[in-house]
């Protein structure tokens, strides 16, 4: 990421006197960029003060193996911050990118009948996969930088 934030969640809520976090998951990477300002306006109107962000965003953060792009995420975080909406940044590992499944099909889960479950839904990976763990940790480290 290009910008360091000066606050730590949840101190933003308690220090501002706004109390409990109110909001939900926000997935702006799944919608056209033009909806961002309207989404934020409606969040402010509804009293939203916190969103969980980047839950399903691995493929947007790392569109190709080893190529990371955080500009869009920085932009969204900055816009939310300007509206006093705190961000609970997710690990972005709920859904892995297609390139990971194509290179490492062994990360796909196997159902109770021994059938490989295809990619395309949330958490369609084996939690015990050392390959998945390696890639997920790399992503999380980059997010933390």
Task: Please provide the spans of the model-predicted regions.
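Structural motif
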Residues: 16, 43, 127, 144-145
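The substrate-binding groove and active-site-proximal loops of carbohydrate-active enzymes
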Residues: 21-33, 54-73, 116-138, 144
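An acidic-aromatic substrate-binding cleft motif
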Residues: 2-37, 41-49
């Amino acid at each position: 990421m290009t910008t360091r934030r000066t606050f730590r969640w949840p101190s933003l809520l308690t220090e501002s006197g706004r109390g409990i976090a109110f909001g939900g998951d926000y997935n702006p990477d799944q919608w056209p960029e033009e909806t961002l300002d309207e989404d934020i306006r409606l969040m402010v109107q509804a009293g939203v003060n916190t969103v969980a962000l980047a839950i399903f965003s691995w493929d947007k953060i790392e569109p190709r193996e080893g190529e990371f792009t955080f500009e869009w995420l920085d932009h969204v975080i900055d816009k939310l911050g300007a509206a006093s909406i705190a961000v609970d940044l997710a690990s972005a590992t709920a859904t892995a990118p297609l390139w990971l499944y194509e290179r490492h099909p062994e990360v796909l889960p196997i159902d109770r009948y021994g059938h490989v479950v295809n990619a395309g839904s949330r958490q369609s990976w084996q939690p015990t996969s050392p390959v998945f763990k390696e890639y997920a940790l790399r992503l999380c480290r980059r997010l933390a930088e």
